[in-house]
Design a protein with these regions (language model features):
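Conserved phosphate-handling catalytic cores of large alpha/beta enzymes
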Residues: 155, 171, 187-190, 195, ...
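Compositionally biased, charge-rich terminal segments
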Residues: 1-2, 341
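Catalytic cores of large soluble enzymes that bind and process phosphate-bearing ligands
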Residues: 1, 26, 66, 70, ...
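Primarily NTPase-proximal linker/entry elements flanking Walker-type ATP/GTP-binding cores
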Residues: 3-179, 186-200, 204-206
Length: 344
């Protein structure tokens, strides 16, 4: 992901990197290319406009450090704004004591939610936390069976010694759709079993749909009220792009999602969802799925992602070092003024 966007941004910013002096016109010309690159990457249009306006304003008003070329300063501005766009993020799963900590996963059908449940269980198991995974997606009996297979594989093959349990009521699949509250009842009983077993974390795999509809949202809202999860995570397919952001916004409006997990992040998708979802929904990206193995779930770090997008980690480090040196120099000058009584 981001290979195409990284190349286009590199081309746009390279027009500035060799210049000894940069005018406002130079900056605006470069940002037009940046804007085109972001739109082509399927970043939300409103996000792109705000981002480019902020970079231009920052770049024009920024004091250039003596040890940097102006073009390097602009790269630093773009990097900082990318970090702000995707962050701040705290990827740690905040556990409650006494447990269990309840994590509710939701998402559209095909988003990779069931696999992500397994990856999240493996992530927690590897950190010494016992987990129970509960199957509350009852509209498809195969979904319950698949989650059971995934959970047992994590229990047998996952790193760490902590236990991973599976809770399911497969007979309830036949009742699902004929009466309301079936999935809610399963979640309540799963929580009761999790408390009885003494696990640290309960993960609820809820029902998905091919598209967002009111019955789905009402069911999720009912589960939310019934078990009061500590965190609600929305699983979003990174390959879907702009549609993923729109669905994330719809989920967040009804459920107040605490974080987003981007699945299929290792795909050749254009990356627009990663750059848009935080600004559009207010919910930060917590994790990204980077492969098919259970351990392929990574904490999301905006700083690292911004450096990866720009493909200019050395330049960004140079900017940060130069800014630190300027801050130290200013501090020394201030101390000198205070010592000589010249502070005004």
């Amino acid at each position: 992901m981001f290979e195409s966007l990284s190349g286009q941004l590199g081309t746009a910013l390279s027009s500035l990197s060799g210049r000894g002096r940069i005018s406002e016109a130079n900056i605006r010309d470069a940002m037009r290319e940046v804007r085109d690159a972001l739109l082509e990457a399927d970043v939300h249009e409103g996000v792109v406009s705000d981002f480019c306006d902020q970079v231009v304003a920052d770049a024009i008003g920024r004091k250039v450090t003596t040890s940097l070329k102006p073009g390097e300063e602009i790269i630093g501005v773009v990097h900082d704004r990318l970090v702000e766009l995707m962050g701040p993020v705290d990827s740690h799963v905040m556990l409650v004591d006494p447990g269990p900590t309840i994590l509710m996963l939701c998402g559209l059908q095909g988003s990779g939610k069931t696999t992500t449940c397994g990856k999240l269980a493996a992530y927690l198991k590897g950190r010494g936390k016992s987990v129970m995974v509960a199957a509350a997606d009852l509209q498809r009996p195969a979904a319950v069976e698949q989650l059971g297979i995934v959970t047992r594989q994590v229990e047998q093959e996952g790193r760490g010694q902590a236990a991973v349990h599976f809770y399911a009521e497969p007979d309830k699949c036949a009742e699902y759709g004929k009466a309301t509250g079936i999935a809610v009842g399963v979640c309540r009983r799963a929580l009761k079993e999790a408390k009885k077993t003494g696990v640290d974390v309960l993960i609820l795999d809820t029902a998905g749909r091919l598209h967002i509809d009111d019955p789905l949202m009402k069911e999720l809202e009912s589960i939310n009220r019934a078990v009061n999860p500590h965190q609600i995570y929305l699983v979003v397919d990174a390959m879907v792009g702009q549609d993923a952001v729109n669905s994330a916004r719809s989920f967040h409006e009804r459920l107040a999602v605490d974080g987003v997990i981007l699945s299929k992040f290792d795909s050749d998708s254009r990356g627009g969802a990663a750059l848009s979802v935080k600004r559009v929904t207010g919910a930060p990206i917590k994790f990204v799925g980077t492969g098919e193995r259970f351990e392929d779930l990574e904490e999301f770090h905006p700083e690292r992602m911004a450096g990866r997008i720009l493909g200019m980690g050395d330049v960004v480090s140079l900017v940060e070092k130069a800014q630190q040196e300027v801050s130290e120099q200013e501090a020394e000058q201030l101390a000198e003024k205070m010592a000589t009584g010249r502070l005004t």
